[in-house]
UniProtKB/Swiss-Prot annotation:
Keyword terms: Cytoplasm, Lipid A biosynthesis, Lipid biosynthesis, Lipid metabolism, Lyase
Swiss-Prot/TrEMBL catalytic activity: a (3R)-hydroxyacyl-[ACP] = a (2E)-enoyl-[ACP] + H2O
EC number(s) reported in the record: 4.2.1.59
Organism taxonomic ancestry: Bacteria, Bacillati, Bacillota, Bacilli, Lactobacillales
Superkingdom in the source lineage: Bacteria
Biological source species: Lactococcus lactis subsp. lactis (strain IL1403) (Streptococcus lactis)
Protein name: 3-hydroxyacyl-[acyl-carrier-protein] dehydratase FabZ
Gene3D superfamilies noted in UniProt: Hotdog Thioesterase (3.10.129.10)
Length: 144
């Protein structure tokens, strides 16, 4: 992989997501079919208002969404996919291993392992301080 520093402005050029649903802050490594990105988790995230006010924990499905968005940055930053959308079509073998709380930095790693036409399968994992927080297999459809 090639070490890079793709900032949030460039991420927003690839992804259609915006606050409060943009869950990728920076890309730090990228290759043809692999990406590593960062999500800095703060107490200011809207989901912490209800999940849970006295014990804020990032919902696991949003960790998986952050991983999906990281994979989306990789796919949508390719010139041939400019102007297209990536639709999250499913997730399998998802495991949550560590709670993610305010102050954590999620390191998001996604690797495309299979493609067939507009459908792609990605192996993804999120870590905090080098410890596995979540992992799973994501399926995408490239569209529009």
């Amino acid at each position: 992989m090639t070490e890079v520093n793709i900032n949030v402005t460039e991420i927003m050029e690839a992804l259609p997501h915006r606050y409060p649903f943009l869950l990728v802050d920076r890309v730090i490594d990228i290759a043809e079919d692999e990406i590593t990105a960062i999500k800095n988790v703060t107490i200011n995230e809207e989901f912490f208002q209800g999940h849970f006010p006295q014990y804020p924990v990032m919902p696991g499905v949003l960790i998986m969404e952050a991983l999906a968005q990281a994979a989306g940055v990789l796919e949508l930053s390719k010139p041939e996919n400019k102007g297209k959308l990536v639709f999250y079509a499913g997730m399998d073998n998802v495991k949550y291993k560590k709670q993610v709380t305010p102050g954590d930095q999620l390191v998001l790693h996604a690797k495309f392992i299979k493609r067939r036409g507009p459908i792609a399968v990605v192996e993804a994992e999120a870590t905090v301080d080098g410890k596995l927080a979540a992992k799973g297999t994501l399926t995408f459809a490239l569209g529009r």
